[in-house]
Amino acid sequence: MFEKLEELAKDNKKISDFHIRAGSPLAYRQTGEIVKVQEVVVTAQDLKDLLSMNCNEHELNKFEKTHELDTSVSLSGLRFRANFYKTINGPACVC
């Protein structure tokens, strides 16, 4: 999932948001439309890894307690605002 996310972020300037949800295909908003990457299904572990790679212990504790977190995500030198939240199907993120 991370490789595809990095590839899309680097190569396409028209993407405004990534929608990352456990159990669903990786999705992004491009010129107002949601596009799903069917070959990349996001796992709960993918999102946990994304959180742990980008958050300190205080932020992780806050996420566990409140089920949401506004932070930032860095991938290959690119930085994004991110909102992590929990759904009935597991963690999710919009960045």
Model-assigned labels for residue ranges:
Residues 1-95:
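N-terminal "pre-motor" subdomain/linker immediately upstream of P-loop NTPase catalytic cores
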